[in-house]
Amino acid sequence: MWYLLLPTALLLTVSSGVGAGLQKAVVNLDPEWVRVLEEDCVILRCQGTFSPEDNSTKWFHNKSLISHQDANYVIQSARVKDSGMYRCQTAFSALSDPVQLDVHADWLLLQTTKRLFQEGDPIRLRCHSWRNTPVFKVTYLQNGKGKKYFHRNSELSISKATHADSGSYFCRGIIGRNNISSASLQISIGDPTSPSSFLPWHQITFCLLIGLLFAIDTVLYFSVQRSLQSSVAVYEEPKLHWSKEPQDK
């Protein structure tokens, strides 16, 4: 009965489609700062699954396809025009989530690896100078108040972020004979999200389809049962009539 095999076929099709949707490419920055200065070198690396026949990578900058097919996209000398959202895709990977890169033209820049952190995340901030010019007497400030001082330029590290670490940050230091300050950067700390609280869309769809297929199977089962019972009721065993032959005299 082909209609009994239909739910199984649908289940296999849905399962393969959902499995394919689980793979998504990932864009990583090297170095991992999301804010850089002009003339900095930035490498964007696409992590995904390739096919034996096609090892090319599709890169997108602000939704426009880039004529570059290597897994690593190198920006040798960044310019402000290179700012924007970057995404990548491979043969066996879905389009990645966007990664924002900001390129600034300035003497001093406060760098960060993220703009939004969760409670408990480590935070790294760096007071970066144009062309890596030496910077001395570096002060990191939060909401206008000094947070950390370094005689020689060093990163500001916070091992576990709390809501108290939210706020407006900037850094200042001595370059040559000039006291220079960076532009301010807003750092936000959110509550940690629980992965088990919300299912991804493909898992929700899969669960709904499983329930639908179960309902179809149940309806078909009882429908077949009723059909069989009706067939048995209609069919009646023929009655045999025996007659006694007259005996020969």
Curated annotation (Swiss-Prot):
Keywords: Cell membrane, Disulfide bond, Glycoprotein, IgE-binding protein, IgG-binding protein, Immunity, Immunoglobulin domain, Membrane, Phosphoprotein, Receptor, Signal, Transmembrane, Transmembrane helix. Glycans are attached at N55, N62, N179. Residues 225-249 are cytoplasmic. The record marks D217 as: Important for receptor turnover. Disulfide bonds join C46-C88, C127-C171. GO terms for molecular function: IgE binding; IgE receptor activity; IgG binding; IgG receptor activity; immune receptor activity; low-affinity IgG receptor activity. Residues 1-20 form the signal peptide. SMART domains: IG, IGc2. GO terms for biological process: antibody-dependent cellular cytotoxicity; calcium-mediated signaling; cell surface receptor signaling pathway; cellular response to lipopolysaccharide; dendritic cell antigen processing and presentation; Fc receptor-mediated immune complex endocytosis; Fc-gamma receptor signaling pathway; macrophage activation. GO terms for cellular component: cell surface; external side of plasma membrane; extracellular space; Fc-gamma receptor III complex; plasma membrane. It is found in: Cell membrane. It is a single-pass type I membrane protein. Residues 31-103, 117-188 form the Ig-like C2-type domain. The chain crosses the membrane at residues 204-224. It comes from the Eukaryota. SUPFAM superfamilies: Immunoglobulin (SSF48726). Residues 21-203 are extracellular. N-glycosylated. The modification Phosphotyrosine is found at Y235. InterPro entries: Ig-like_dom, Ig-like_dom_sf, Ig-like_fold, Ig_Fc_receptor, Ig_sub, Ig_sub2. Receptor for the invariable Fc fragment of immunoglobulin gamma (IgG). Binds with intermediate affinity to both IgG2a and IgG2b. Can bind to IgG2a and IgG2b monomers. Does not display binding to IgG1 or IgG3. Recognizes neutralizing virus-specific IgGs displayed on the cell surface of infected cells and triggers antibody-dependent cellular cytotoxicity (ADCC). Confers protection to lethal influenza virus infection. Forms a heterooligomeric complex with ITAM-containing signaling subunits FCER1G. Interacts (via transmembrane domain) with signaling subunits; this interaction is a prerequisite for receptor complex expression on the cell surface and intracellular signal transduction. Binds the Fc region of antigen-complexed IgG. This is Low affinity immunoglobulin gamma Fc region receptor III-A. It comes from Rattus norvegicus. The gene is Fcgr3a.
